[in-house]
Protein backbone atom coordinates (compact mmCIF):
# COMPACT_ATOMS: atom_id res chain seq x y z
CA UNK A 1 0.00 0.00 0.00
CA UNK A 2 2.92 2.40 0.64
CA UNK A 3 2.36 5.76 -1.07
CA UNK A 4 3.01 9.41 -0.41
CA UNK A 5 -0.16 11.22 0.62
CA UNK A 6 -1.95 14.57 0.29
CA UNK A 7 -4.65 15.47 2.84
CA UNK A 8 -6.94 18.23 1.56
CA UNK A 9 -9.24 19.97 4.05
CA UNK A 10 -12.01 21.93 2.31
CA UNK A 11 -13.01 24.16 5.20
CA UNK A 12 -16.73 24.82 5.67
CA UNK A 13 -18.08 22.49 2.96
CA UNK A 14 -20.58 19.93 4.26
CA UNK A 15 -23.36 17.65 3.04
CA UNK A 16 -26.92 18.96 3.22
CA UNK A 17 -29.63 16.92 1.48
CA UNK A 18 -31.74 20.07 1.21
CA UNK A 19 -30.56 21.88 -1.93
CA UNK A 20 -32.27 25.18 -1.00
CA UNK A 21 -29.76 27.96 -0.16
CA UNK A 22 -27.06 25.29 -0.50
CA UNK A 23 -24.01 26.91 -2.15
CA UNK A 24 -22.30 23.54 -2.60
CA UNK A 25 -25.28 22.15 -4.55
CA UNK A 26 -25.70 25.33 -6.60
CA UNK A 27 -22.04 25.50 -7.65
CA UNK A 28 -20.64 24.15 -10.93
CA UNK A 29 -18.20 21.53 -9.66
CA UNK A 30 -16.87 19.11 -12.28
CA UNK A 31 -14.02 17.95 -10.02
CA UNK A 32 -16.40 16.97 -7.22
CA UNK A 33 -18.74 15.21 -9.70
CA UNK A 34 -15.78 13.16 -10.93
CA UNK A 35 -14.72 12.31 -7.37
CA UNK A 36 -18.23 11.10 -6.46
CA UNK A 37 -18.21 8.80 -9.53
CA UNK A 38 -14.66 7.48 -9.38
CA UNK A 39 -13.29 7.60 -5.82
CA UNK A 40 -14.40 5.67 -2.68
CA UNK A 41 -16.33 8.16 -0.55
CA UNK A 42 -18.48 8.39 2.55
CA UNK A 43 -19.68 10.87 5.18
CA UNK A 44 -17.96 11.79 8.45
CA UNK A 45 -19.38 13.28 11.65
CA UNK A 46 -17.89 16.67 12.60
CA UNK A 47 -20.04 17.89 15.49
CA UNK A 48 -20.96 17.06 19.07
CA UNK A 49 -19.34 14.20 20.94
CA UNK A 50 -17.72 12.90 17.71
CA UNK A 51 -15.23 15.77 18.06
CA UNK A 52 -15.29 16.16 21.86
CA UNK A 53 -17.97 18.86 22.00
CA UNK A 54 -21.34 18.76 23.79
CA UNK A 55 -24.03 16.79 21.93
CA UNK A 56 -25.62 18.88 19.17
CA UNK A 57 -22.84 21.49 19.25
CA UNK A 58 -21.62 22.45 15.78
CA UNK A 59 -18.00 21.70 15.01
CA UNK A 60 -15.42 24.38 14.28
CA UNK A 61 -12.03 24.71 12.62
CA UNK A 62 -9.94 24.51 15.78
CA UNK A 63 -11.64 21.38 17.07
CA UNK A 64 -11.82 19.79 13.62
CA UNK A 65 -8.13 20.23 12.85
CA UNK A 66 -7.08 19.02 16.29
CA UNK A 67 -9.22 15.92 15.84
CA UNK A 68 -7.83 15.28 12.34
CA UNK A 69 -4.21 15.90 13.31
CA UNK A 70 -4.22 14.00 16.60
CA UNK A 71 -6.27 11.05 15.37
CA UNK A 72 -8.37 10.95 18.52
CA UNK A 73 -11.32 12.68 20.20
CA UNK A 74 -10.03 15.32 22.59
CA UNK A 75 -12.62 16.66 24.99
CA UNK A 76 -12.60 20.32 24.19
CA UNK A 77 -12.28 23.21 26.60
CA UNK A 78 -15.99 23.89 26.18
CA UNK A 79 -16.83 20.49 27.71
CA UNK A 80 -14.10 20.79 30.37
CA UNK A 81 -15.34 24.24 31.45
CA UNK A 82 -18.99 23.13 31.52
CA UNK A 83 -18.00 20.31 33.89
CA UNK A 84 -15.93 22.65 36.08
CA UNK A 85 -18.91 25.02 36.45
CA UNK A 86 -21.31 22.15 37.22
CA UNK A 87 -19.13 20.60 39.91
CA UNK A 88 -18.08 24.00 41.38
CA UNK A 89 -14.41 23.42 40.52
CA UNK A 90 -14.16 26.72 38.63
CA UNK A 91 -14.78 28.90 41.69
CA UNK A 92 -12.07 26.99 43.59
CA UNK A 93 -9.51 27.49 40.80
CA UNK A 94 -6.24 28.60 42.40
CA UNK A 95 -5.32 31.20 39.75
CA UNK A 96 -8.81 32.71 39.92
CA UNK A 97 -8.71 32.90 43.72
CA UNK A 98 -5.30 34.63 43.59
CA UNK A 99 -6.55 37.27 41.14
CA UNK A 100 -9.74 37.96 43.12
CA UNK A 101 -7.72 38.34 46.33
CA UNK A 102 -5.23 40.71 44.70
CA UNK A 103 -7.59 42.95 42.67
CA UNK A 104 -10.62 44.75 44.11
CA UNK A 105 -11.95 45.62 40.66
CA UNK A 106 -12.30 42.86 38.06
CA UNK A 107 -13.16 43.11 34.34
CA UNK A 108 -14.68 40.17 32.46
CA UNK A 109 -14.08 40.30 28.68
CA UNK A 110 -15.35 37.92 26.02
CA UNK A 111 -17.61 37.03 23.15
CA UNK A 112 -21.17 36.90 24.49
CA UNK A 113 -23.23 34.32 22.56
CA UNK A 114 -24.03 30.63 22.71
CA UNK A 115 -22.05 29.94 19.51
CA UNK A 116 -19.65 27.70 21.41
CA UNK A 117 -16.83 28.27 18.91
CA UNK A 118 -14.84 30.87 20.87
CA UNK A 119 -16.85 31.14 24.08
CA UNK A 120 -20.17 30.47 25.79
CA UNK A 121 -22.54 32.98 27.39
CA UNK A 122 -22.99 30.53 30.30
CA UNK A 123 -19.24 30.71 31.07
CA UNK A 124 -19.38 34.52 31.03
CA UNK A 125 -22.31 34.54 33.47
CA UNK A 126 -20.73 31.93 35.75
CA UNK A 127 -17.59 34.08 36.01
CA UNK A 128 -19.58 37.26 36.73
CA UNK A 129 -21.38 35.40 39.50
CA UNK A 130 -18.22 33.96 41.08
CA UNK A 131 -16.50 37.38 41.10
CA UNK A 132 -19.55 39.27 42.40
CA UNK A 133 -20.20 36.73 45.18
CA UNK A 134 -16.57 37.09 46.21
CA UNK A 135 -17.23 40.78 46.90
CA UNK A 136 -15.22 42.24 44.01
CA UNK A 137 -16.44 45.21 41.98
CA UNK A 138 -17.16 43.62 38.60
CA UNK A 139 -17.34 45.09 35.07
CA UNK A 140 -18.80 43.18 32.10
CA UNK A 141 -17.33 43.87 28.63
CA UNK A 142 -19.42 42.05 26.03
CA UNK A 143 -18.21 41.40 22.49
CA UNK A 144 -21.11 40.83 20.09
CA UNK A 145 -20.94 37.85 17.73
CA UNK A 146 -23.18 37.71 14.63
CA UNK A 147 -20.88 35.22 12.93
CA UNK A 148 -21.10 31.92 14.82
CA UNK A 149 -24.74 32.81 15.52
CA UNK A 150 -27.20 34.80 13.41
CA UNK A 151 -26.26 38.45 12.64
CA UNK A 152 -28.93 40.11 14.82
CA UNK A 153 -29.21 37.57 17.65
CA UNK A 154 -27.14 39.94 19.79
CA UNK A 155 -30.18 41.87 20.94
CA UNK A 156 -31.53 38.91 22.91
CA UNK A 157 -28.10 37.95 24.23
CA UNK A 158 -27.32 41.49 25.38
CA UNK A 159 -30.78 41.95 26.92
CA UNK A 160 -30.12 38.74 28.88
CA UNK A 161 -26.68 39.97 29.99
CA UNK A 162 -27.94 43.43 30.97
CA UNK A 163 -30.65 41.92 33.21
CA UNK A 164 -28.17 39.43 34.68
CA UNK A 165 -25.73 42.26 35.52
CA UNK A 166 -28.48 44.37 37.10
CA UNK A 167 -29.61 41.47 39.31
CA UNK A 168 -26.03 40.77 40.41
CA UNK A 169 -25.04 44.39 40.98
CA UNK A 170 -22.41 44.19 38.25
CA UNK A 171 -21.52 47.10 35.91
CA UNK A 172 -22.38 46.48 32.25
CA UNK A 173 -19.49 48.60 30.97
CA UNK A 174 -18.86 48.25 27.22
CA UNK A 175 -20.10 46.73 23.99
CA UNK A 176 -18.19 46.07 20.77
CA UNK A 177 -18.45 43.81 17.71
CA UNK A 178 -15.95 40.99 17.22
CA UNK A 179 -14.78 42.58 13.94
CA UNK A 180 -12.85 45.07 16.10
CA UNK A 181 -12.23 43.31 19.41
CA UNK A 182 -11.32 39.91 17.96
CA UNK A 183 -9.28 40.66 14.85
CA UNK A 184 -6.56 38.08 14.19
CA UNK A 185 -4.99 39.48 11.02
CA UNK A 186 -2.88 42.27 12.54
CA UNK A 187 -5.34 45.00 11.64
CA UNK A 188 -4.27 46.95 14.69
CA UNK A 189 -6.51 49.95 13.97
CA UNK A 190 -9.51 47.75 14.82
CA UNK A 191 -8.03 46.48 18.08
CA UNK A 192 -7.00 50.04 18.99
CA UNK A 193 -10.67 51.13 18.91
CA UNK A 194 -11.53 48.42 21.42
CA UNK A 195 -8.49 49.13 23.60
CA UNK A 196 -9.56 52.78 23.87
CA UNK A 197 -13.09 51.69 24.73
CA UNK A 198 -11.79 49.54 27.61
CA UNK A 199 -9.86 52.58 28.83
CA UNK A 200 -13.10 54.59 28.86
CA UNK A 201 -12.38 56.69 25.77
CA UNK A 202 -15.10 55.48 23.39
CA UNK A 203 -18.52 56.74 22.35
CA UNK A 204 -20.59 57.13 25.55
CA UNK A 205 -24.24 56.03 25.69
CA UNK A 206 -26.83 55.91 28.50
CA UNK A 207 -28.05 52.43 27.50
CA UNK A 208 -25.98 49.82 25.62
CA UNK A 209 -29.04 47.78 24.65
CA UNK A 210 -30.65 50.81 22.99
CA UNK A 211 -27.32 51.55 21.29
CA UNK A 212 -27.32 48.03 19.81
CA UNK A 213 -30.87 48.50 18.47
CA UNK A 214 -29.86 51.88 17.02
CA UNK A 215 -26.93 50.16 15.24
CA UNK A 216 -29.37 47.65 13.71
CA UNK A 217 -31.52 50.56 12.53
CA UNK A 218 -28.42 51.84 10.72
CA UNK A 219 -27.85 48.39 9.15
CA UNK A 220 -24.88 47.57 11.37
CA UNK A 221 -25.15 43.98 12.63
CA UNK A 222 -23.57 42.29 15.66
CA UNK A 223 -20.17 41.47 14.18
CA UNK A 224 -19.56 45.09 13.14
CA UNK A 225 -20.91 47.03 16.16
CA UNK A 226 -18.63 50.01 16.85
CA UNK A 227 -17.17 50.16 20.36
CA UNK A 228 -19.34 52.02 22.87
CA UNK A 229 -19.33 52.40 26.64
CA UNK A 230 -21.89 53.06 29.30
CA UNK A 231 -21.74 56.75 30.20
CA UNK A 232 -20.98 55.86 33.85
CA UNK A 233 -17.96 53.73 32.98
CA UNK A 234 -14.65 55.50 33.69
CA UNK A 235 -12.21 52.94 32.26
CA UNK A 236 -9.76 50.33 33.48
CA UNK A 237 -7.14 51.12 36.10
CA UNK A 238 -3.67 49.60 35.93
CA UNK A 239 -4.17 47.72 39.21
CA UNK A 240 -7.45 46.09 38.03
CA UNK A 241 -7.79 42.38 37.28
CA UNK A 242 -8.85 41.30 33.77
CA UNK A 243 -10.35 37.88 33.03
CA UNK A 244 -10.70 36.67 29.43
CA UNK A 245 -13.61 34.29 28.94
CA UNK A 246 -12.91 33.04 25.40
CA UNK A 247 -11.51 29.51 25.50
CA UNK A 248 -10.30 29.63 21.91
CA UNK A 249 -7.05 31.51 21.57
CA UNK A 250 -6.63 32.78 18.02
CA UNK A 251 -8.95 35.80 18.18
CA UNK A 252 -7.90 36.95 21.66
CA UNK A 253 -4.13 36.96 21.23
CA UNK A 254 -3.89 40.44 19.72
CA UNK A 255 -6.03 42.04 22.42
CA UNK A 256 -3.98 40.39 25.19
CA UNK A 257 -0.80 41.61 23.51
CA UNK A 258 -2.13 45.19 23.37
CA UNK A 259 -3.16 45.15 27.04
CA UNK A 260 -0.17 43.30 28.47
CA UNK A 261 2.95 43.24 26.27
CA UNK A 262 5.81 45.58 27.18
CA UNK A 263 7.29 45.21 23.67
CA UNK A 264 4.18 46.19 21.70
CA UNK A 265 5.02 48.84 19.06
CA UNK A 266 2.00 49.01 16.71
CA UNK A 267 0.41 52.07 18.37
CA UNK A 268 0.92 54.26 21.42
CA UNK A 269 -0.73 52.95 24.60
CA UNK A 270 -1.64 54.94 27.64
CA UNK A 271 -1.71 51.96 30.03
CA UNK A 272 -0.34 48.43 30.28
CA UNK A 273 -1.99 45.87 32.55
CA UNK A 274 -0.33 43.12 34.57
CA UNK A 275 -3.17 41.29 36.31
CA UNK A 276 -4.52 39.19 33.43
CA UNK A 277 -6.05 35.71 33.61
CA UNK A 278 -7.04 33.80 30.48
CA UNK A 279 -9.47 30.90 30.16
CA UNK A 280 -6.95 28.76 28.24
CA UNK A 281 -3.34 29.14 27.04
CA UNK A 282 -3.58 31.86 24.37
CA UNK A 283 0.13 31.83 23.52
CA UNK A 284 3.09 30.38 25.44
CA UNK A 285 4.97 33.68 25.03
CA UNK A 286 2.45 35.53 27.24
CA UNK A 287 3.59 33.82 30.49
CA UNK A 288 0.17 34.56 32.02
CA UNK A 289 -1.80 32.48 34.52
CA UNK A 290 -4.62 30.44 32.95
CA UNK A 291 -7.76 28.75 34.24
CA UNK A 292 -7.52 25.62 32.09
CA UNK A 293 -4.03 24.40 31.22
CA UNK A 294 -3.34 22.67 27.92
CA UNK A 295 -3.84 18.94 27.79
CA UNK A 296 -0.67 17.26 26.55
CA UNK A 297 -1.28 15.58 23.20
CA UNK A 298 1.52 13.22 22.18
CA UNK A 299 2.00 11.06 19.08
CA UNK A 300 0.11 13.29 16.67
CA UNK A 301 0.13 12.53 12.95
CA UNK A 302 2.82 15.18 12.33
CA UNK A 303 4.99 13.84 15.18
CA UNK A 304 4.81 10.22 13.97
CA UNK A 305 5.73 11.29 10.42
CA UNK A 306 8.60 13.43 11.71
CA UNK A 307 9.97 10.67 13.98
CA UNK A 308 9.94 8.29 11.00
CA UNK A 309 12.29 10.68 9.19
CA UNK A 310 9.72 11.53 6.49
CA UNK A 311 9.14 15.03 5.13
CA UNK A 312 5.88 16.95 5.42
CA UNK A 313 4.44 20.21 4.12
CA UNK A 314 1.68 22.17 5.90
CA UNK A 315 0.13 25.00 3.88
CA UNK A 316 -2.87 27.35 3.96
CA UNK A 317 -3.65 31.03 3.62
CA UNK A 318 -3.44 33.34 6.63
CA UNK A 319 -7.02 32.79 7.84
CA UNK A 320 -6.47 29.04 8.30
CA UNK A 321 -2.69 28.85 8.73
CA UNK A 322 -2.94 28.31 12.51
CA UNK A 323 -5.29 25.41 11.85
CA UNK A 324 -2.90 23.36 9.69
CA UNK A 325 0.03 24.14 12.01
CA UNK A 326 -0.75 24.86 15.69
CA UNK A 327 -4.10 23.04 15.94
CA UNK A 328 -3.25 20.22 13.53
CA UNK A 329 -0.05 19.55 15.51
CA UNK A 330 -1.98 19.15 18.77
CA UNK A 331 -1.66 22.71 20.08
CA UNK A 332 2.09 22.97 19.51
CA UNK A 333 3.64 25.94 17.73
CA UNK A 334 7.17 24.65 17.17
CA UNK A 335 8.29 23.31 13.80
CA UNK A 336 9.06 19.57 13.73
CA UNK A 337 12.07 18.03 12.04
CA UNK A 338 11.53 17.71 8.25
CA UNK A 339 8.35 19.84 8.49
CA UNK A 340 7.99 22.75 6.07
CA UNK A 341 5.27 25.39 6.39
CA UNK A 342 4.11 27.66 3.60
CA UNK A 343 1.90 30.60 4.54
CA UNK A 344 -0.01 32.27 1.70
CA UNK A 345 -1.31 35.76 2.66
CA UNK A 346 -5.11 36.12 2.63
CA UNK A 347 -6.39 38.99 0.47
CA UNK A 348 -6.72 42.32 2.28
CA UNK A 349 -10.45 42.87 1.84
CA UNK A 350 -13.01 43.88 4.46
CA UNK A 351 -15.03 40.66 4.04
CA UNK A 352 -14.30 37.74 1.75
CA UNK A 353 -17.48 37.97 -0.33
CA UNK A 354 -15.52 40.75 -2.08
CA UNK A 355 -13.02 38.12 -3.26
CA UNK A 356 -14.56 34.64 -2.88
CA UNK A 357 -11.62 32.82 -4.49
CA UNK A 358 -9.48 34.32 -1.67
CA UNK A 359 -5.91 32.97 -2.15
CA UNK A 360 -7.00 29.45 -3.16
CA UNK A 361 -5.07 29.36 -6.43
CA UNK A 362 -1.83 30.39 -4.74
CA UNK A 363 -2.41 27.73 -2.05
CA UNK A 364 -3.05 25.20 -4.83
CA UNK A 365 0.27 26.12 -6.46
CA UNK A 366 2.09 25.55 -3.15
CA UNK A 367 0.59 22.03 -2.96
CA UNK A 368 1.55 21.17 -6.53
CA UNK A 369 5.11 22.37 -5.88
CA UNK A 370 5.19 20.15 -2.77
CA UNK A 371 4.07 17.12 -4.80
CA UNK A 372 6.63 17.84 -7.52
CA UNK A 373 9.32 18.21 -4.86
CA UNK A 374 8.36 14.80 -3.46
CA UNK A 375 7.15 15.69 0.07
CA UNK A 376 6.07 12.46 1.81
CA UNK A 377 2.96 14.05 3.33
CA UNK A 378 1.13 17.28 2.53
CA UNK A 379 -1.75 18.82 4.46
CA UNK A 380 -3.56 21.79 2.97
CA UNK A 381 -6.59 23.85 3.97
CA UNK A 382 -8.82 25.72 1.53
CA UNK A 383 -10.56 28.42 3.57
CA UNK A 384 -13.18 29.54 1.04
CA UNK A 385 -16.28 27.52 1.98
CA UNK A 386 -16.01 28.68 5.57
CA UNK A 387 -14.77 32.25 5.32
CA UNK A 388 -17.14 33.19 2.49
CA UNK A 389 -19.93 31.16 4.12
CA UNK A 390 -19.55 33.41 7.17
CA UNK A 391 -20.42 36.49 5.10
CA UNK A 392 -23.93 35.17 4.35
CA UNK A 393 -23.55 36.07 0.66
CA UNK A 394 -25.01 33.12 -1.27
CA UNK A 395 -23.66 34.03 -4.71
CA UNK A 396 -20.18 34.66 -3.31
CA UNK A 397 -20.33 31.28 -1.53
CA UNK A 398 -21.12 29.57 -4.86
CA UNK A 399 -18.01 31.20 -6.36
CA UNK A 400 -16.02 30.08 -3.31
CA UNK A 401 -17.01 26.43 -3.87
CA UNK A 402 -16.20 26.73 -7.57
CA UNK A 403 -12.71 28.06 -6.78
CA UNK A 404 -12.10 25.11 -4.43
CA UNK A 405 -13.42 22.71 -7.07
CA UNK A 406 -10.93 24.05 -9.64
CA UNK A 407 -8.08 23.61 -7.16
CA UNK A 408 -9.17 20.06 -6.27
CA UNK A 409 -9.12 19.13 -9.96
CA UNK A 410 -5.57 20.43 -10.35
CA UNK A 411 -4.26 18.76 -7.19
CA UNK A 412 -5.90 15.40 -7.96
CA UNK A 413 -4.41 15.42 -11.45
CA UNK A 414 -0.96 16.31 -10.08
CA UNK A 415 -1.26 13.64 -7.34
CA UNK A 416 -2.15 10.92 -9.86
CA UNK A 417 0.72 11.93 -12.15
CA UNK A 418 3.21 11.52 -9.28
CA UNK A 419 1.55 8.40 -7.77
CA UNK A 420 0.33 10.15 -4.60
CA UNK A 421 -2.65 8.93 -2.59
CA UNK A 422 -5.10 11.61 -1.48
CA UNK A 423 -7.76 12.11 1.17
CA UNK A 424 -10.25 14.97 0.77
CA UNK A 425 -12.52 16.00 3.63
CA UNK A 426 -13.77 19.03 5.61
CA UNK A 427 -13.42 20.06 9.24
CA UNK A 428 -17.10 21.10 9.44
CA UNK A 429 -19.91 22.45 7.24
CA UNK A 430 -21.02 26.03 6.59
CA UNK A 431 -21.73 27.09 3.00
CA UNK A 432 -24.20 24.23 2.36
CA UNK A 433 -26.82 26.10 4.45
CA UNK A 434 -26.80 29.86 3.81
CA UNK A 435 -30.38 30.69 4.86
CA UNK A 436 -33.03 29.12 7.06
CA UNK A 437 -36.60 28.34 5.97
CA UNK A 438 -37.72 31.88 6.85
CA UNK A 439 -35.03 33.45 4.67
CA UNK A 440 -32.82 34.56 7.57
CA UNK A 441 -29.12 34.54 6.72
CA UNK A 442 -27.13 31.70 8.26
CA UNK A 443 -23.52 32.75 8.73
CA UNK A 444 -22.62 30.04 11.23
CA UNK A 445 -21.23 26.51 10.91
CA UNK A 446 -23.61 23.58 10.53
CA UNK A 447 -23.89 20.24 12.33
CA UNK A 448 -24.09 18.33 9.03
CA UNK A 449 -21.74 15.51 8.12
CA UNK A 450 -18.94 16.16 5.63
CA UNK A 451 -17.70 14.23 2.61
CA UNK A 452 -14.56 12.12 2.68
CA UNK A 453 -12.85 10.77 -0.44
CA UNK A 454 -9.93 8.32 -0.28
CA UNK A 455 -7.88 7.45 -3.35
CA UNK A 456 -5.10 5.03 -2.32
CA UNK A 457 -3.73 1.67 -3.41
CA UNK A 458 -5.91 -1.18 -2.19
CA UNK A 459 -8.74 1.05 -0.89
CA UNK A 460 -12.14 0.30 -2.42
CA UNK A 461 -14.51 1.03 0.48
CA UNK A 462 -14.68 3.27 3.55
CA UNK A 463 -16.08 1.95 6.85
CA UNK A 464 -19.40 3.28 8.16
CA UNK A 465 -19.88 5.62 11.14
CA UNK A 466 -16.44 7.17 11.00
CA UNK A 467 -15.37 10.66 12.10
CA UNK A 468 -12.52 13.14 11.78
CA UNK A 469 -10.53 11.23 14.40
CA UNK A 470 -10.15 8.31 11.94
CA UNK A 471 -8.18 10.29 9.35
CA UNK A 472 -4.71 10.34 10.97
CA UNK A 473 -4.50 6.54 11.17
CA UNK A 474 -5.61 6.39 7.52
CA UNK A 475 -2.70 8.62 6.47
CA UNK A 476 -0.24 6.50 8.48
CA UNK A 477 -1.63 3.33 6.89
CA UNK A 478 -1.06 4.83 3.42
CA UNK A 479 2.49 5.90 4.40
CA UNK A 480 3.02 2.38 5.82
CA UNK A 481 3.90 3.69 9.30
CA UNK A 482 2.89 2.17 12.63
CA UNK A 483 -0.31 3.61 14.11
CA UNK A 484 0.21 4.69 17.76
CA UNK A 485 -2.12 3.28 20.42
CA UNK A 486 -3.53 6.76 21.17
CA UNK A 487 -5.11 6.99 17.72
CA UNK A 488 -8.51 5.76 16.57
CA UNK A 489 -8.74 3.21 13.74
CA UNK A 490 -8.29 4.04 10.04
CA UNK A 491 -11.19 4.72 7.65
CA UNK A 492 -10.49 1.52 5.67
Swiss-Prot record:
Signal peptide: none annotated. It is an enzyme of class 5 (isomerase). One of its GO terms (cellular component) is cytosol. Substrate binds at residues 118, 147-148, 178, 184, 248-251, 320. Pathway: Carbohydrate degradation; glycolysis; pyruvate from D-glyceraldehyde 3-phosphate: step 3/5. GO terms for molecular function: manganese ion binding; phosphoglycerate mutase activity. Its cofactor is Mn(2+). It comes from Campylobacter jejuni subsp. jejuni serotype O:6 (strain 81116 / NCTC 11828). Belongs to the BPG-independent phosphoglycerate mutase family. Catalyzes the interconversion of 2-phosphoglycerate and 3-phosphoglycerate. This is 2,3-bisphosphoglycerate-independent phosphoglycerate mutase. One of its GO terms (biological process) is glycolytic process. Its EC number is 5.4.2.12. PANTHER family: 2,3-BISPHOSPHOGLYCERATE-INDEPENDENT PHOSPHOGLYCERATE MUTASE.
Amino acid sequence: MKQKCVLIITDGIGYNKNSKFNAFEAAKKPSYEKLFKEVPNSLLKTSGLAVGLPEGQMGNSEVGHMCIGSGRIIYQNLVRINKAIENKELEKNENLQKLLAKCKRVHIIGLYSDGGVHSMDTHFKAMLEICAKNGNEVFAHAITDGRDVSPKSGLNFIKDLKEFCENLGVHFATLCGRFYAMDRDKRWDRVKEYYECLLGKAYKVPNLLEYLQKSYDENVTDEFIKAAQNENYKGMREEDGIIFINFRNDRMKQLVEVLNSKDFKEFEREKIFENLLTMSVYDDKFKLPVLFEKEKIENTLAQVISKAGLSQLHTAETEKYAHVTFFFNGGKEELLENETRVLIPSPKVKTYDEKPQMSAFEVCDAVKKGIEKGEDFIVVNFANGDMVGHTGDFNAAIKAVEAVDTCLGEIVECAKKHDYAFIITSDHGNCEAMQDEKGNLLTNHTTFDVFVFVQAKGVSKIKDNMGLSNIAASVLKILDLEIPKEMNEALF
